[in-house]
């Protein structure tokens, strides 16, 4: 726990992250002690900083379930949504994770409209909406390149209807005009 190296099968292994070990030990030694909620929350932050989003989300969920009266419970809800958003922004855009993140951010804003984090949550909702519009537009482009024009139109119309004032709606409208000229 103090940065000591561990051995496995005779091989010395470095400590991955001392903070994770420390926070885990605090929680194990005093699950309902006064430092446990902060340790659980900070464990989630440490995991999130290492891009271990699912584990971080689990840690934040434990803050909410084990310490519902903690002032960190509110921040944990925001962090859960943030983890979902991070997963959705990965190299393989995950529409399901993006939808979950958007719903969790919206729920956070509904439950905590005056919280400082609500402004950031609203900003994240807008970013997720934009990312979804971009993804839908790109699917339309894919179908257009495959000469599946009717399918492309469906996706372009979806972008226009869901996000009429976005740059992606403008692009989709332009593509629709080009498809109409093809006829």
Sequence positions of predicted segments:
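Acidic, polar-rich low-complexity tracts and alpha-helical solenoid repeat scaffolds
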Residues: 1-183
């Amino acid at each position: 726990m103090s940065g000591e190296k561990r051995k496995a099968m005779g091989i010395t292994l470095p400590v991955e992250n001392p903070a994770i070990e420390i926070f885990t030990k605090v929680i194990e030694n005093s699950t309902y002690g006064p430092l446990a909620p902060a340790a659980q929350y900070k464990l989630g932050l440490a995991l999130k900083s290492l891009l271990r989003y699912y584990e971080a989300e689990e840690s934040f969920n434990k803050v909410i379930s084990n310490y519902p009266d903690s002032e960190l419970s509110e921040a944990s809800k925001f962090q859960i949504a943030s983890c979902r958003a991070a997963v959705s922004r990965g190299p393989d855009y995950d529409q399901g994770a993006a939808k979950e993140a958007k719903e969790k951010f919206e729920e956070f804003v509904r439950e905590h409209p005056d919280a400082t984090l609500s402004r950031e949550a609203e900003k994240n909702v807008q970013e997720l909406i934009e990312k979804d519009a971009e993804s839908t537009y790109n699917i339309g482009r894919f179908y257009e390149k495959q000469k599946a024009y009717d399918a492309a139109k469906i996706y372009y119309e979806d972008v226009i209807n869901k996000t009429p004032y976005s740059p992606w709606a403008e692009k989709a409208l332009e593509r629709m005009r080009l498809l109409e000229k093809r006829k």
